[in-house]
Amino acid sequence: MNSTFRTLAEPNRLRVVELLREGPLTVGEIANRLGLSQPQASKHLRALSAAGLVEVQAIANRRICKLRPLPLLELEVWLESFRHSWDEKLDRLGNYMQEL
């Protein structure tokens, strides 16, 4: 999970993940939508792929990129534990405020 956070801490990589949430894209499409050169987009995709967040498949002369759900599901489970804790604390605070 640490590598996921480290990888997503770079703003362009987070933007790539947000784009791929809509569905698979080619490297060129990602570069165009983010205003990056293809080498820059490829560099970010290599980092995302190394972290297990993105899968890149070569089809003819195109590289199709798509999200890999498992690392994102692990983050969701981890965040859910915080959400549950905060919900309980906010409920107690709400009850306390009503008693006042």
Regions found by a protein language model. Name each.
Residues 73-100:
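Amphipathic alpha-helical dimerization/coiled-coil segments
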Residues 1-2, 100:
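Absolute protein N-terminus
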